[in-house]
Amino acid sequence: MGSVSLSDIQVTPLARIATDGGDVMHALKKNDPDFVGFGEAYFSWLDHQKVKAWKCHTEMTMNLIVPFGQVRFVFCDLDSEPEVFRIEEIGDYNYSRLTVPPGVWFGFQGLKVNSSLVLNIADIPHDPSEVKKLGEHEINYNWS
């Protein structure tokens, strides 16, 4: 894994097509430019104002989508002094996919009253040995 920058995170607006029976929501196509492979897809529920932070995948490319709710993703460059952050909010009001390369520290927070749902379409199956973790307060970011 080479050096990674917060600018390497891709934001792709996604189609949300209204139909009589309910919306059709696109996620990821094999021929999308940022598709690098399929290993696993999994969902994570996130309660209102709750935070899940901080993680860094050393091998996994994540494709993060919020099909229900609204979520603030905070990405951090720990090599900068002081730390540099990039914030992306996706979901009901900005239906998009975030493609995050390996080596980026991140956390996320639920913004919708009740719950939000995050989908990760990863290029490899989940492997706990390739994940680094820090506690929520170990990176100096104010979630309020």
Where are the language model's segments positioned?
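Non-catalytic, conserved peripheral segments adjacent to functional cores
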Residues: 1-97, 111-144
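Glycine-centered loop/turn positions within well-structured domains
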Residues: 106
